[in-house]
Amino acid sequence: MKLRDKWKIYLGLTTIKVQCPCFFLFHNDENRTTTSNLDSVKSKKKRRKTISDASIVSNGSLVSHPSIDKGKLSILKRYKMSHRLTAIDKLRPLTVLVAWKQLNIAMRPIFPQHRYTEQDKKNWKKKVIIEDLNFLVLRCICACEAISDFEELLGNMRIGLIIDISLLGMNSNESSFLHYLVEVWSIFYLEILPYIEATFLPVTFAKFEIAQLFEEPMKTYWLKKSANIDLKLFSIWVFRKFVVMPKLKKTNRFIEIPQLNTQQQILLVQMISIISLIKPQDESEDLLMNWLNELTLKFLYV
């Protein structure tokens, strides 16, 4: 064999059978056919598209990034898991309850009622990392062993959002109900809602590439089934049902209209226009919404 051919074999530029004993340094089987480096790279890329549940739990988190060319979600990338989560998993096995508790604790800084100190109020965004929250949501899905576990997980998610959103105004010092609604709405819509949508991205946008992360067909089916969940619409409904309506029921109909600046007026109109998109569940809610609309119209045209 010529020296040039030997170099081609070493660089992987040809495909022939090699009988040389030194070939064992590169392959275990002397009769195995060598392949090009380009083909091996392609095969590795194909294998990375599907990641098992075990690798998600043990190796790291996954997060989606927008593609520059097509503007869609690109293939999800893995992130290294924090030492804190690794230590917890070593102490006790991962279950749906344990995974949900970890996610619930990690989401607390998003809501103002869980920011106890001045430092928490100023630096709460530094404690909230969307990639870690996405990873914790995937851990919850990995811990599910049946469709009943997955449905229970979705139920816990709804209950948790209802509790946290309904307590948004507990620290408000505004005496006027319109000032109160404007203040709470600005916090909810501008700060909290984007984080809620980004956190539960693996559940709400499974139709893109999230479902490909699971090798088990059933878990892929669960995620595709949950793709109809509109967490933004659900969160807005919770805000209207448990924040706006209780405040309106306690307000005197003949109350004097307070003064609002331009920014507050914009927020008030925005809130009413958005929460009015959801159909009232009963007649009392319909009456309260009509009264709020009339009051706002009078206020704007005074």
Swiss-Prot record:
Q: Which InterPro entries match?
A: Bit61/PRR5
Q: Which GO terms describe its biological process?
A: TORC2 signaling
Entry's Pfam families? HbrB
User: What are its GO cellular component terms?
Assistant: cytosol; nucleus; TORC2 complex
Tell me where on the tree of life, at the top rank, the source sits: Eukaryota
Q: What name has this protein been given in UniProt?
A: Uncharacterized protein C6B12.03c
Q: Which organism is it from?
A: Schizosaccharomyces pombe (strain 972 / ATCC 24843) (Fission yeast)
